Amino acid sequence: MAGTGARDQVRKVIDETLEAQNAGDAARLRSMLSERPDAVHIGTDAEEWDTSNQVVDAVAAAGGDDIQAVADEFDIHIQGDVAWAEGRGRFTRAGGGERPVRMTCVLIRENGQWKVVQSHASIGVPNADIFG
C-alpha cells in the first residue's frame, strides 16, 4: 500500500485541478490533465463527456465561472502508478446556494507527475425520483 506522501500528492493534484478549473486557468488545468487520447471527463450535464483537450478548451472559452466546485472529502487509493479517488464535495454559486456533488477520478503517473486521466461528477437523485 502506498504511503501517505503519495496520497497527499494525489489530493494536491485533485485540489489544484479544481482550483484551476474554478479560476478559468486553462494553462494550469492542462498541466494537471493527462493528454492521452482515451482520457475522459464526465460532468453532471448529459452532454458533458469530454477529452482532456475539450475540458481545457471549454475552460479557456468560459474563463472563471460563478459556479465553483469544492472537494470536501476524498478516499484515495494507490496501486503503483495508478491512483483512484472517490469523494463528496459541493457546487457553490457566487450569489449564494450550493448543491452536494459526488466525484470520482483516476490518476496515472506520467513522467513522475500525477495526471488526471478520468473524472466524473454527479448530483445524486433518489431512486424513487428516477422514473417518478
Regions found by a protein language model. Give the residues of each.
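Short, low-complexity N-terminal intrinsically disordered segments enriched in polar/charged residues
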Residues: M1-E35, A128-I130
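Short, well-ordered beta-strand segments in beta-rich or mixed alpha/beta enzyme
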Residues: T17, L29, L33, H41-G43, ...
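Hydrophobic/aromatic beta-strand elements that line small-molecule binding cavities or substrate pockets
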Residues: T17, V55, V59, A71-I76, ...
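A solvent-exposed, acidic/Ser-Thr-rich amphipathic alpha-helical stretch
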Residues: A26-I78
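Short, cysteine-centered beta-strand-loop-beta hairpins and adjacent loop/turn segments enriched
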Residues: G64, F91-E98
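Residue-level preference for beta-strand/loop junctions
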Residues: I67-Q68, D81-A83, R99
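Flexible loop/coil segments at beta-strand boundaries within sensory signal-transduction domains
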Residues: Q79, A94, R109-Q113
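Short beta-strand edge/turn micro-motifs at domain boundaries
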Residues: W84-E86, P100-I130
